[in-house]
Amino acid sequence: MKRRNFIISSLSGIAAASVASTPILSSCCTAPKEKKQETPLNLCLQEGVALGDSLEEKLDFMEAHGVTGLEVGGGNLKSRVEEINKALQGRNIKASAICAGFSGFILAEDEQKQQFDTTMREIVEAAGQIGSCGVIMVPAFNGQNPCKPHTMDTRNYLCEQLHELGEFALKCGTTVILEPLNRRECFYMRLVSDAAAICRDSDSEGVKCMGDFWHMQEETSDYAAFMSAGTKYLRHVHVASRGRRLMPGEDGEKDDYRDGMRALKEMGYQGHISFECGCEGDRATVLPAALDLLRKQWEEA
């Protein structure tokens, strides 16, 4: 029965989140059509993906290729606030999401929970200081132990903990961003709709979620995944090739993102699509080609 209640509560997020971000027709009367505003494609690179030996060189590369977001890791972020703010000053690039970097995990049943609370809040505070949109987190990876059991009580506990963390993030001027993973990496939260439902039930504007083209392909359609969260909850997107998690385009025809991009355009998504991937070929050639591929598919979506 507990499992049934858990599933019902999670799946209801699809309808609730979508309705929250979808306009409702108030009448069938013909009205003048307003010109639809185009949704921009905002591209972002993780710091380790961009070309360059220093942060300045990486940002120079990004500016030269029209990339407007920088995703950095959360490890030692507190000590890098001044460096990052100085490097971004005067550029058309801003700090996007922060990629984890904390110790422990939120569903731990031992001292790892305290480690999470301390380090996560430190990263969240630093994220606000560099103008980041949020800190990415996964409630629990496969293999992390001891972990709370997969029950409705655990889900309720998670929502309570996220409410507190989300409210703290808001005070810091940022958010926390839940990332669903595929079943090989995470037993707990695999669907964007699951994450959106947890955002809803956490009852804090400081709790958001994201989608990752790599993880989503194993669980649901890209279009359905993004639409299940809507603009109310969707804050960030990751992208990689769809065969080996390399640069978009390195897996050939498999690397088709147009279905998900169509959802992002229809909902008016304003966040970044960030490269989280490896690279097999010459990065100086492959990375610009990957950026061009995403721009082409965005136009076609």
State where each predicted segment sits.
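Histidine-acidic metal/acid-base catalytic patches
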Residues: 2-44, 51-66, 131-133, 189-211, ...
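Active-site-adjacent beta->alpha loops and helix N-cap segments on the catalytic face
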Residues: 78-87
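A short beta-strand-loop structural module common to alpha/beta enzyme folds
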Residues: 68-77
